[in-house]
Amino acid sequence: MKRAVVVFSGGQDSTTCLVQALQQYDEVHCVTFDYGQRHRAEIDVARELALKLGAVAHKVLDVTLLNELAVSSLTRDNIPVPDYQPDAEGIPNTFVPGRNILFLTLTAIYAYQVKAEAIITGVCETDFSGYPDCRDEFVKALHHAVSLGMAKDIRFETPLMWLNKAETWALADFWGQLDLVRQETLTCYNGIKGDGCGQCAACNLRANGLNQYLGDKVGVMAVMKQKTGLAQA
């Protein structure tokens, strides 16, 4: 039996990963993390979507210690979430230091226990928003460390790594779930479901990608299929 675990936030990217995983694996588990995030409504959204889409198990892990250690606008109510700034440079204040290190490591422990062969995460280097822990180099390095530490090679799959947001929308559409991802996921840093607040960086990235996809569905779909190997599907 092919078994995978999805790092699942209930946002656009991880939901698209879950939708695809359910087509490619016999059994799919989801792991969601409660770290006291400002947009913690995503946890309820994740629960709803995992149940609706058919994950066999959904584990919500309490990692509120991360909130105590990592200072970010996503972990502190007194630090405002910045509006979208297309020319911004450097690491944004929405970056939560160590988040993906912790999430992937804990998910690997869970995957080890349920005998899963793969961990799937929606990180993306193409539209990575300046987050260093969304880079391919980081994921490969952590995978190497985890494999050594567990003496077991649990694959780290990153199906969105080289897709832009328009192509990620195309992937959701390919699997017949564009409307669900658009209406029922929560990507917004301010915790607003669907199209979100329209002001934060996450909402702008999501909206711009959707508009680009809807403006050239055939072209974007073709590029996505080539990048993902779905061209033969």
From Swiss-Prot:
* UniProt-annotated binding residues for ATP: 8-18
Please give the catalytic activity noted in the UniProt record. 7-carboxy-7-deazaguanine + NH4(+) + ATP = 7-cyano-7-deazaguanine + ADP + phosphate + H2O + H(+)
User: What pathway is it annotated to?
Assistant: Purine metabolism; 7-cyano-7-deazaguanine biosynthesis
Quote one Gene Ontology molecular function term: ATP binding
Q: Which cofactor does it need?
A: Zn(2+)
> Which terms does the UniProt entry file under GO BP?
queuosine biosynthetic process
**Keyword Nucleotide-binding on entry:** yes
Question: What does the entry's cofactor note say about binding and number?
Answer: Binds 1 zinc ion per subunit.
Sites where the protein binds Zn(2+): 188, 197, 200, 203
Q: What is its EC number?
A: 6.3.4.20
Q: State the InterPro entries in the record.
A: QueC, Rossmann-like_a/b/a_fold
Classification via Pfam families? QueC
Name the Gene3D superfamilies for this protein: HUPs
**Keywords, alphabetical:** ATP-binding, Ligase, Metal-binding, Nucleotide-binding, Queuosine biosynthesis, Zinc
* Signal peptide range in chain numbering: none
What family does the Swiss-Prot or TrEMBL record give for this protein? Answer: Belongs to the QueC family.
Name the job this protein performs.
Catalyzes the ATP-dependent conversion of 7-carboxy-7-deazaguanine (CDG) to 7-cyano-7-deazaguanine (preQ(0)).
**What is the protein name for this chain?**
7-cyano-7-deazaguanine synthase
The protein's organism comes out as Klebsiella pneumoniae (strain 342)
User: According to the entry, what is the taxonomic lineage of the organism?
Assistant: Bacteria, Pseudomonadati, Pseudomonadota, Gammaproteobacteria, Enterobacterales
